[in-house]
Amino acid sequence: PKELPNSENVTYVTVDFAHQSLTERLLNAGFDRTKSTVFTLEGVTQYISKEAFNSTMKEMSRLCQKTSSIFALSFVNELLNKNPEDCFGRGYLNPEKKANLIKKLSAKAAGEPWISFYSTEEIEGLLSENGYSIKENVTLEDLNSLYFGPVGRTLSENEIFKLEHFVIAESKE
């Protein structure tokens, strides 16, 4: 969006993670390896294979060897498949049914099913192996008390989805 401050410094790059090289797509879009970079991969990790995500992390790490980078991503917790009750707030009715509905609707809306789910430890490991350290890892439950509570819009426990994590990681220096 042009109304963003410093939008001239923002480049959106599309990539088919299964068939294209992220490095090639970024370099073709004018990526400058000498400048600090913020990468954003929100709503992507659940749609691509774990191998594609790991490969993406490796490419970003190699691209930014000579400078710093920040990586923002979201991931869907593996508990959605393993224990849906833990992904929803206390008192949430029929969590298994809701988990299946969410996966079904996301596949229909995006035209692709969710195929990759992660534990926090797995994401931390992948980031660490590729030169990043997590600075923040939050769920809607965390954001509820931080942002909604102070303005009187706190979500009740049975309205909270804890399935998606929002992560900020920074390249290790």
Feature names for model-found ranges:
Residues 1-173:
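Alpha-helical subdomain
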